[in-house]
Amino acid sequence: MGKKYIESSKLIDKNALYTPAEALELAVKTAKAKFDETIELHVRLGVDPRHADQQVRGAVVLPHGTGKDVKVLVFAKGEKAKEAEAAGADFVGADELVQKIQGENWFDYDVVVATPDMMGVVGRLGRVLGPKGLMPNPKSGTVTFDVANAIKEIKAGKVEYRVDKTAIVHCPIGKKSFGTEKLVENFKALMDALVKAKPAAAKGQYLKSVSVSATMGPGAKVNPAKVLD
């Protein structure tokens, strides 16, 4: 463990449950790296991800974005390709992009959008894009004919959330430079979406634990009962 991390850890009471504002203030204070660290939210949910009816997945536009310049790749043809280019997509194409990704192991983009008619083509990339979380999905709004709106939302700060195998959701909610107030608003937007996404099949306590941390910093626990206060 680095010296900075140990110093930062002393600022956080490991047994305390903080309000979102208190926890985020600590996350900002403990971000000691020389770069503008990302502030991340970690939520352990009371679901069993092995069951299809207990999956938690979706997307939400953060009011202040993520602070990251997001590169969008769009699979579309004809008019929809023109729409995507006009809306500010970084890369637009069809079969030639599939070949480039397969042949060159090319991943110079953050989000992939596809029109529904292109999913047969994109499906060939399942094994490549799937493990990286880049496969377009209707639940997150990345399989759509409304490519212009999808690109606009992604560029404005839309983030995808998805429960992993250990029932945890990890998601960026901004940068250290945002300051506590903007981070709290982003935090609440994401928590609101997570609460609304609770599967009907989930039993017992849904929000098991909530914490925030800077990329290189220690975690501060948030009281699950106060996440939307």
Swiss-Prot record:
The keyword Glycoprotein is annotated on this UniProt entry: no
Gene Ontology CC: large ribosomal subunit
Family matches, as InterPro entries: Ribosom_uL1_bac-type, Ribosomal_uL1, Ribosomal_uL1-like, Ribosomal_uL1/biogenesis, Ribosomal_uL1_3-a/b-sand, Ribosomal_uL1_CS
One Pfam family linked to the record: Ribosomal_L1
GO molecular function: rRNA binding; structural constituent of ribosome; tRNA binding
Keywords of the record: Repressor, Ribonucleoprotein, Ribosomal protein, RNA-binding, rRNA-binding, Translation regulation, tRNA-binding
Swiss-Prot/TrEMBL GO biological process terms: regulation of translation; translation
Subunit structure: Part of the 50S ribosomal subunit.
Protein family: Belongs to the universal ribosomal protein uL1 family.
Function: Binds directly to 23S rRNA. The L1 stalk is quite mobile in the ribosome, and is involved in E site tRNA release. Protein L1 is also a translational repressor protein, it controls the translation of the L11 operon by binding to its mRNA.
UniProt name for this protein: Large ribosomal subunit protein uL1
Source organism of this protein record: Clostridium perfringens (strain 13 / Type A)
